[in-house]
Structures are given as C-alpha cells and as structure tokens.
A protein has these predicted regions:
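Conserved AMP-binding A3 loop
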Residues: 28-30, 160-184
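Structural core segment of the AMP-binding/adenylate-forming
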Residues: 41, 45-46, 73-140, 432, ...
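AMP-binding/adenylate-forming catalytic core of the ANL superfamily
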Residues: 85, 102-104, 241, 249, ...
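Conserved AMP-binding/adenylation subdomain of ANL enzymes
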Residues: 183-201, 209-248, 262
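Gly/Ser/Thr-rich phosphate-binding loop
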Residues: 221, 246-251, 260-325, 338, ...
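Conserved ATP/PPi-binding loop(s) of AMP-dependent carboxylate-activating enzymes
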Residues: 332-336, 345-378, 416
Length: 510
C-alpha cells in the first residue's frame, strides 16, 4: 500500500464529508483533494519533478493538509522546516537536502527572504499573498490549475518525506520515509493508538507538517475530521474541544502541563472527548496522576522516534486505569513492531537487564539522506534500527525507558540515568521543571548536577531537594549541585535539551 493511494481512497469514499475545520471555515474531502490536485499541477509547472526536494516553512492553516497531499501526488519529497529553528539551521537543512524550492506561509515571509538571500538558486513561493511581489502566490496559481489528479507513477520505495530529528544530541539528522513506510505509519496508528469512525474528530495544535500530521491520514481513511489550530493556547485549545465536538487530542507532556497549570483543565467541558494521545517526551508522574484524577482513563501513551514513528510501544487506557508503577512505563510493544534489547555489541541482554532498544517494523526509515556511514551505524542490513534509547522489560513485558545512551552519567564508576533523578526531583511539590546532566569533577569524573525551576510562589532549598532525592534513590544518584534557573531549555517537540545545560559546564575540559 502507498501513502498516495490512501489519500485517493479517502477522497473517493468520503467526498462530501467535512475533512478539515479551521476557525469558522471548513473543507470537505473533495475540496481538500481538489486543492491538492491543483497544487500538484502548480508544482509541476514550476519545474519540480518526481524525487525533487521541496522545503516547507508553514504554520497551520486551512490548506495545510492539501499541501501535504499535493506533494504526495506530485511525487516530490517534503522537507518540513520547524519555524522555531534558527536561520542557520534552516539553511543547513535546505543545503544538505538540495532543496531548490521553498514554500512558505505569509507569516514567515521574513525568514523565507533571509533564506533566499543566503542561498543561490533557492526559489520562493508563498501559500497566499506575499508581501514580496516577485514571489509566486500559490493560492492564486491554484485557482487556474487543472483539478484533475495528475496520477503520476509511484513506487513503494519512493522517498516522500525527509524529517529532521530534533537534535537533542546537537547533530541534525535527516531521516527518510517512503510511500510504503508512511502508509505503514498510518496502519501503525490505527492498530495501536486510535480507531476513529466517521463521527470522530482530532484536534491539532502542533505543526501539521511535522509529527502531528501523521494523525491526519488515519482519520482521513476512516471518514473522520481534523480541527486545526494555528498554535497552542491553553484557553483556545480547551474551548475547541467542546466547540467542535472533539473526540481525540494529540499532545506532548508540556502542552498537558500548560492545560493543568491554572486549574482550568479540571473545570473544562470535555464534551465528546474520549481519547488523549501523548508522547514525544517523558510524562512527569505527578502530572499524569493529576490528569487522570481530573479526566479519567482517556489517556494513551506512545513511544517512538523520527526514525521509527510513531508507535514502538503503547501504554493504553486500561494501563492508565491500573495506574501505579505502570504510569512510569513506555508500554507494551506495538502489534506491528519487533523490539529487542541489546548490549553494546548487539547481543540480546538477559531478561530484566538494561539494553539498547532496537526495532524492526514496516514503518521505520529508509536511512539518513546522503549519510551512508551514519545510516550504516543506525540501520542494519537486516532492517533493525538502533534507537540509542536504553530500557528494560519488566516481568509483564512492559518496556521501561531508562535514558538516552548519550545522556548517561558515569560517576565514580556507577551509571546514573538522568531521567530517574529528574523523576525524583519532579515529585517534590515545589519543582515545576528540572533537568539533570553530568558535570566535570576531579574526584568522580562526572558529578550529577541538577537544574530546577520552581513553581510560582513555591520555595525549596538546594539541601531540601537533595534530601528529597536521597530518600528515593541511591546516594551516588543524589545531585552534587542544584542550580535554580528561570527556564529549562526544550527542543521544538518538547524534549529537554540537556546539551544546552551540559556543554557550558564542560568548556575547557574536553
């Protein structure tokens, strides 16, 4: 099955149903599909052909889904750019992937012009009226383009998407996904996370050209709808749940924390809401317990990564209802994924021991773009992908993530995983956010070091927090130093950027 075939099947079956809601406007399946056809012809008229890379610098909007589908139908490779990244990062992404056409939204015209000026040969096209008259208005061009499906040939191994990792290690990597793997992502979501029907509606506030967009096709092929917000505002988000009859949410822990920050989430009208899917970063135990108390067992957690989206493991609603230790688990393996834990040499570890998670599944990447050596280190010839995540299985078969192998701290010969220390710190009532890294130490080589932000109006001393951790973990895991800071740095997808805290501590040491 190809991803483009899923688009065509959904359009044919549900032509008259509403597919997308944006504010007070909506589009039917037929309208989304026709716009995709027209945009595909516009792209072809710009000289973009099968296999060419097209950069996307877009916020969420009425035509976001049509743009994605247009790229599929035109046979081009989407290279989405996160608007929160720097111009230098955007430039590197575009250059490394050989992008010659950048499609941007009017609100990001300034960045688009900056990129155009820094890159010879980069053409710019605006999804709407641009403040720059010499840039093509794709919406105007779309109105006069053919509405017929271009019906270009497509093959399972055709690369259709290049997704850059969030760069928590400081290295941007371009994971490639194909027609077949993207269709498999849709099947993975339907098999493990949601099972929508024609009356189901998912709310999107994160960027559709990134991970959130993977939930569009599962609802599309079942006749459901997407409510698309321009960004995440807690009040607007909760209002949309009742306004549009939303049945499912897709969010990251940071978003859930913002929803519950002022108590409004407890008072919100949830209407038809039945499922809250979350993932992308660890969920603080106090937060999920509070959310469960308020909203009940509507929650489903997934663990995955850019190289193997979306769901390697799942912690389902029944698991959340059981609660207890299970709330700290990543879940049980997805029905369409094979997982194994290995040592540094690649051999399986004994039951209960910590090992690196490796996965084999139809939805894994086809390798990193133009990086054969990096691909060889991460993707074996037998199809197994190294995740670089350390984990263990419990006696019930649930996977428990320990940490990233690159984040592990070795202090006095003992291994310390930052996440377990962060979990202990986060259980203190005064702690809002925290991050743990290793700092250079003449005696221990690395010293466990914590960065903490306190809740508004709360107080806690360094000694109190160290005592709190000591009551829960071994002595060598207790932070030697606690730094109180205003903010903790996060990546665009909500992962702690430990390197931003760690690297300054090691200047001159390595």
């Amino acid at each position: 099955m190809l991803a483009v075939d899923l688009v065509r099947r959904g359009a044919a079956r549900f032509a008259g149903r509403i597919a997308v809601h944006v504010e007070d406007r909506s589009l039917t399946y037929a309208e989304v599909d026709e716009a995709a056809n027209r945009l595909a012809h516009v792209l072809a008229g710009l000289g973009v052909s099968r296999g060419d890379r097209v950069g996307l610098l877009l916020g969420n909007g009425l035509w976001s889904v049509s743009v994605d589908f247009a790229c599929l139908k035109a046979g081009v490779v989407r290279v989405p750019l996160n608007g929160r990244l720097s111009a230098a990062e955007h430039t590197r992404m575009l250059r490394d992937t050989g992008v010659t056409l950048l499609v941007y939204g009017p609100e990001l015209a300034g960045r688009a012009v900056e990129l155009g000026e820094s890159m010879d040969g980069l053409r710019l096209a605006c999804l709407g009226e641009s403040p720059h008259a010499d840039h093509l208005d794709l919406m105007a061009a779309m109105r006069t383009a053919s509405a017929a499906d271009p019906m270009l040939p497509a093959a399972p191994d055709d690369v259709i998407l290049i997704l850059y990792t969030s760069g928590t290690t400081g290295t941007l990597k371009a994971a490639q996904h194909t027609q077949a793997s993207y269709a498999a992502i849709t099947a993975n979501i339907l098999s493990n996370l949601v099972s929508p029907g024609r009356d189901d509606v998912m709310l999107h506030a994160a960027s559709l050209i990134h991970a959130s967009g993977t939930f569009v096709l599962p609802y599309w092929v079942r006749g459901g709808a997407a409510v698309v917000l321009g960004g995440f505002d807690p009040d607007e988000y909760l209002d949309a749940v009742s306004r549009y009859g939303v049945t499912a949410l897709n969010l990251v822990p940071t978003m859930l924390g913002m929803l519950f920050a002022d108590g409004r989430a407890e008072r919100a009208d949830l209407g038809r809401l039945s499922t809250v899917v979350y993932g992308a970063s660890p969920m603080p135990r106090p937060l999920i317990e509070r959310a469960l108390d308020a909203w009940g067992p509507r929650f489903v957690q997934y663990f995955g990564q850019t190289e193997a989206p979306l769901c390697l493991t799942v912690l389902d609603k029944d698991d959340h209802a059981e609660g207890g230790a299970l709330l700290g688990a990543a879940g049980h393996p997805a029905v369409d994924a094979r997982l194994v834990l290995t040592d540094e040499g690649g051999a399986p570890v004994a039951p209960g021991e910590i090992g690196e998670v490796r996965v084999k599944a139809p939805f894994t990447m086809a390798g990193y773009y133009n990086e054969p050596e990096l691909t060889a280190r991460s993707l074996g010839p037998d199809g197994w992908v190294r995740t670089r995540d350390l984990a263990r299985f419990d006696d019930r078969g649930y996977l428990h993530l320990v940490d990233r192998s690159s984040d592990m701290i070795i202090t006095g010969g003992y291994n310390v995983y930052p996440r377990e220390v962060e979990d202990a710190l986060a259980s203190h009532p005064a702690v809002a956010q925290c991050a743990v890294v290793g700092a250079p130490d003449p005696t221990w080589v690395e010293a466990v070091t914590a960065f903490v932000t306190l809740r508004t109006g709360a107080q806690a001393s360094e000694a109190a927090l160290r005592d709190h951790v000591r009551a829960r973990l071994a002595g060598y895991k207790v932070p030697k130093t606690v730094h109180f800071v205003d903010t903790i740095p996060y990546s665009p997808v909500g992962k702690i950027l430990r390197r931003a805290l760690r690297d300054p501590l090691w200047e001159g040491e390595r």
